[in-house]
């Protein structure tokens, strides 16, 4: 052990003679001495020298007088931004020098980190950037279905570059080395433009019909000169009755022979017989049998 003996050999023999055994547990003094030895082992002389030289340099910076060029620069600056007294100026300059030294030391420590960490961070950043570029188009948008580009991201960060393979339909594999987001976005846009040109040529110029609004309105009126388009077939049938003159909805009130082409017209007419007024104003107690009459009445309260 590196521990210094706290007893002499005679005291140890006397202790064995009196008690019959010798305790192997270290005493408080031995523990303290062992701690001192461990501290001296980990705290070598080189850090002490650096700290001592740094303290001496710090004293030189704190007690040194600022050069005249710094004083002239202080005088040229706005007096509201700097203190008036010269002593405070000297202290602020010394603090600036100290902060610059601390900044230099911190930058030096950061530069000593291994290059692998910077390479990993570079790869991680480029991975996030590539994910952001390739996820610019939502899955449900029509642009994705037209510009179908299968992307298989193959990253190789050996030389600090990232390789993105773009596989387009009816095209060969094209490996593009991406250096940043702008280059990746340009590559994806170019591939999309090629695919869009192919899709437009295949479809025969049906770009206007590919819009979501036009996809919904698929029910067109077949009568000559009519351009009405509806999203539901029932609405189309009700509209076609205006051309044919058909009125299948007959009023069931006794003695009434009115017929209508639409069911909502029959319901509105039936309220005249019953006197029902289901549309009530929120600002007053008036009720109406038709919703458009209520809308006209609501304009008075505005």
From Swiss-Prot:
- Location (main, coarse): nucleus
Motif range (Nuclear localization signal): 215-220
Q: Which GO terms describe its cellular component?
A: chromatin; cytosol; nucleoplasm; nucleus
As one GO molecular function, the record gives: DNA-binding transcription factor activity, RNA polymerase II-specific
CDD domains (UniProt xref): KLF7_N
Swiss-Prot/TrEMBL domain comment = The acidic N-terminal part may favor interaction with the basic domain of transcription factors.
Its assembly, as annotated, is: Interacts with FBXO38.
Q: Of which family is this protein a member?
A: Belongs to the krueppel C2H2-type zinc-finger protein family.
Name of protein = Krueppel-like factor 7
Q: Where is the organism placed in the taxonomic lineage, from the top?
A: Eukaryota, Metazoa, Chordata, Craniata, Vertebrata
């Amino acid at each position: 052990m590196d521990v210094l003996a706290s007893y002499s050999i005679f005291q140890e023999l006397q202790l064995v003679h009196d008690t019959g055994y010798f305790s192997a547990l270290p005493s408080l003094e031995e523990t303290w001495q062992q701690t001192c030895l461990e501290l001296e082992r980990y705290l070598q002389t080189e850090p002490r020298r650096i700290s001592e030289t740094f303290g001496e340099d710090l004293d030189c910076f704190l007690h040194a007088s600022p050069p005249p060029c710094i004083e002239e620069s202080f005088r040229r600056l706005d007096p509201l931004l700097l203190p008036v007294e010269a002593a405070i100026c000297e202290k602020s300059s010394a603090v600036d020098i100290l902060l610059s030294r601390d900044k230099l030391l911190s930058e030096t420590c950061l530069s000593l980190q291994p290059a692998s960490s910077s390479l990993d961070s570079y790869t991680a950043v480029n991975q996030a950037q590539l994910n952001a570029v390739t996820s610019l188009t939502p899955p449900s948008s029509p642009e994705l279905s037209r510009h179908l580009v299968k992307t298989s991201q193959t990253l190789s960060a050996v030389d600090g570059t990232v390789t993105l393979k773009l596989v387009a339909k009816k095209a060969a594999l094209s490996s593009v080395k991406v250096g940043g987001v702008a280059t990746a976005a340009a590559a994806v846009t170019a591939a999309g433009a090629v695919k869009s040109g192919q899709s437009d040529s295949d479809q025969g110029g049906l770009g206007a019909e590919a819009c979501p609004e036009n996809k919904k309105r698929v029910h067109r009126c077949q009568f000559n000169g009519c351009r009405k388009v509806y999203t539901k077939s029932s609405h189309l049938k009700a509209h076609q009755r205006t051309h044919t003159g058909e009125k299948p909805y007959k009023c069931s009130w006794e003695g009434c022979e009115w017929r209508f082409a639409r069911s909502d017209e029959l319901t509105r007419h039936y309220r005249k017989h019953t006197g029902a007024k289901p549309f009530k104003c929120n600002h007053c107690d008036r009720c109406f049998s038709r919703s458009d009459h209520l809308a006209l009445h609501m304009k008075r309260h505005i």
